[in-house]
C-alpha cells in the first residue's frame, strides 16, 4: 500500500501426507521484518499439503514450500515431509536467501510414528492392533493434530475388528494423520502467509 515502508511477514509451509508408518511432518515457520519501497510487488506462493499414501505400503507425499518474494529476496517456509510406510515424516525448516534480513523461524514437528501391539481375546482368538501416528504440528502454532487412525484385526480371519481412518492435517501446515488403509486421503494442511503493516 502507498506510504508503507515496513512489513512484518509470517509464513508456514504445508504439512506432509500421512502413511501407515505414521503422521506427516508439520510445515516450517518463517518470519521477518522487511523494509520495502511503497508500491513494491509482493509475490506469494502457498505450499499445498502433501497427499496421504495411496496404498497400505506406500509413502505420503512431501508438502509444498511457502514463499514470499519481494525483488530478489525470498523468504521460505519449507513443507513437511510425507510419512513413510515405516515411520512418520520430518518437519519442515525455514530460510531466507539474503543476509539483509534477520529471519526468525521454527521447524515443524515430526509426525508421530505408528505403534503396533498384539493381544488375545481368548486362547484361540488373537489380534493385532495398530495406533497410527498423528501428524506433526507446524512451527510456531499451538494447533495440535489428533488425526491418527486406528485398526485392529483378527489374526486368523484377517477381518477388521475396529477401523478408524486417519484425517487431514490442521491449517496451517499440520501433518496428515497416519493411516494404513491407503484410501482415506489424510492430506497435510495447507500453508499460510500473514502480512502485517
Residue ranges and their predicted role:
Residues 4, 36-41, 70-74, 164-166:
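A short, structured loop/turn motif at beta-sheet edges
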Residues 170-174:
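Extended alpha-helical scaffolds used as interaction platforms
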Residues 1-18, 126-129, 133-137, 194:
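Beta-rich globular "head" domains
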Residues 50-113, 119:
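Acidic, low-complexity glycine/serine/threonine-rich segments
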Residues 23-24, 72-83, 98-108, 126-129, ...:
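Terminal beta-strand-rich extracellular "head" domains
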Residues 11-70, 89-95, 142, 147-156, ...:
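Glycine-rich strand-loop-strand elements at beta-sheet edges
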Residues 122, 130-133, 141-145:
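Phosphate/pyrophosphate- and phosphate-bearing ligand-binding catalytic cores of soluble enzymes
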